[in-house]
């Protein structure tokens, strides 16, 4: 009796894997077909996630409007999208200079975006500015810059395209946020504050525009690349104890841009309102923040205290 089971089990595993693969391919194909002809705005399109999204939505037949701060990089992305594309199946992307650190230009940017096709079906707010430093070393000017890029910029752009979505009673606004929009860790005060603000804004927006058939989604992910957190001038990297360092490393253990881009596509097509894309440790930390905050606070504070003692030795 054991022999048939040993033979059948691998076959069942292979069949199950095959069915799972086919299912994923069908879902992926359907996801791409659902964005065909849709006007999609992607901010910071030249970043890793932005580029992956651009390729994914372009292959799906979306009418892309790509925003970024560097025109040469935007043109390079344009070339990579159109070089091997079938003009019968895809649309040439529109390029727009979009710099959230220049809030005075936002009104003109919104006008330029709307002039491309007259409307926006999907707005993907992907821009982000990161910083890792002790609170006392961060200037108020830096705080404002981070708030501009991470909060005021996305909210201003969302407000700009909102009237056309309301008039059409259709549209989707998606914020690519961070897990730190829901859970703050030491030495990232400005970044976490801006992400919390963005999370709150889009949560409010979701409730206010649902009656118009507009979907608002937020994706809270761990960092794409934890090695790119600039320190304040002259400040050494803060040290933490083992437990706090482990939690921080898990919170900043990034996902691949391609994985996040696929999650964005699925979120759009399934009209999910909130997605957490994180490893188990950040998820546990979120639960602790809600159900046992004193323990989480103690762990984070112990890490900070340990770093101070280490620097004094």
Can you say where each PLM-predicted feature lies in the sequence?
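Substrate-binding pocket helix/loop in short-chain dehydrogenase/reductase
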Residues: 134-135, 139-144
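SDR active-site lid
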Residues: 207-280
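Active-site helix of classical SDR
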Residues: 158, 194
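Residue(s) in the substrate-gating loop at a strand-loop-helix junction
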Residues: 178
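Conserved glycine-rich cofactor-binding loop
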Residues: 39, 46-47
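Rossmann-fold cofactor-recognition segment
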Residues: 84-104
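Conserved glycine-rich Rossmann-like NAD(P)H-binding loop of the short-chain dehydrogenase/reductase
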Residues: 62-77
């Amino acid at each position: 009796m054991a022999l048939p089971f040993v033979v059948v089990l691998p076959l069942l595993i292979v069949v199950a894997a095959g069915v799972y693969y086919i299912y994923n391919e069908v879902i992926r194909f359907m996801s791409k077909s659902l964005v065909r002809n849709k006007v999609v705005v992607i901010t910071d399109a030249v970043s890793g996630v932005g580029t992956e999204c651009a390729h994914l939505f372009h292959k799906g037949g979306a009418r892309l409007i790509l925003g970024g701060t560097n025109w040469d990089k935007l043109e390079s992305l344009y070339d990579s999208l159109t070089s091997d594309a079938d003009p019968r199946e895809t649309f040439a992307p529109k390029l727009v200079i979009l710099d959230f650190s220049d809030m005075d230009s936002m009104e003109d940017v919104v006008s330029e975006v709307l002039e491309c096709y007259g409307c926006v079906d999907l707005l993907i707010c992907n821009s982000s500015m990161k910083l890792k430093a002790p609170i006392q070393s961060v200037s108020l000017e830096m705080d404002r810059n981070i708030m501009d890029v991470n909060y005021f910029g996305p909210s201003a752009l969302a407000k700009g395209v909102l009237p056309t979505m309301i008039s059409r009673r259709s549209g989707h606004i998606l914020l690519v946020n961070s897990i730190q929009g829901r859970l703050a860790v030491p030495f990232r005060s400005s970044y976490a504050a801006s992400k919390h603000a963005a999370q709150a804004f889009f949560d409010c927006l979701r409730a206010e525009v649902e009656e118009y058939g507009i979907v608002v989604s937020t994706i809270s992910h761990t960092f794409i690349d934890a090695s790119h957190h600039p320190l304040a001038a002259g400040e050494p990297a803060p040290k933490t104890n083992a437990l706090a360092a482990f939690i921080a490393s898990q919170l900043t253990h990034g996902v691949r841009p391609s994985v996040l881009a696929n999650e964005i596509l699925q979120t759009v097509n399934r009209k999910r309102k909130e997605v957490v894309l994180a490893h188990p440790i950040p998820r546990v930390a979120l639960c602790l923040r809600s159900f046992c905050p004193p323990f989480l606070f103690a762990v984070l504070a112990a890490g900070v205290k340990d770093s101070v003692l280490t620097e004094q030795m």
